[in-house]
């Protein structure tokens, strides 16, 4: 592949996207859910120029839309070192019906540790946000971060 054809991809939270990009996503959703809606009417409904819509429409995709074929992702959890913490995490993963690809638990230092999980959600419609939310709700989990995903 020629370097000039190579495009980098970034994972970015919606709340930091420019308004025109967020509106483009909303328009794409509206067009997908209502096949009778024209692009002209959709951009008018969301108060976005057609040129802005055309500029972004093929460059922005919700994470879950791109993960439908390959729903593998890696999370890192920052936890307090207590007996059974890994078991609690794995119990949540099991209840969400996810497959564990790899697990790494760091050696605790100053009663803190990290757990890195590579997961596969291919057989389930669970979103990454659902998984992160469920793990964040566990006692003794101070932070959960998405560190990679396959697309």
From Swiss-Prot:
The segment(s) forming the ACT domain are 74-149
Q: Which InterPro entries match?
A: ACT-like_dom_sf (IPR045865), ACT_dom (IPR002912), UPF0735_ACT_dom-cont (IPR008310)
Q: Identify its protein family.
A: Belongs to the UPF0735 family.
From the Swiss-Prot or TrEMBL record, give the protein name.
Answer: UPF0735 ACT domain-containing protein SAOUHSC_01752
- Source organism per UniProt: Staphylococcus aureus (strain NCTC 8325 / PS 47)
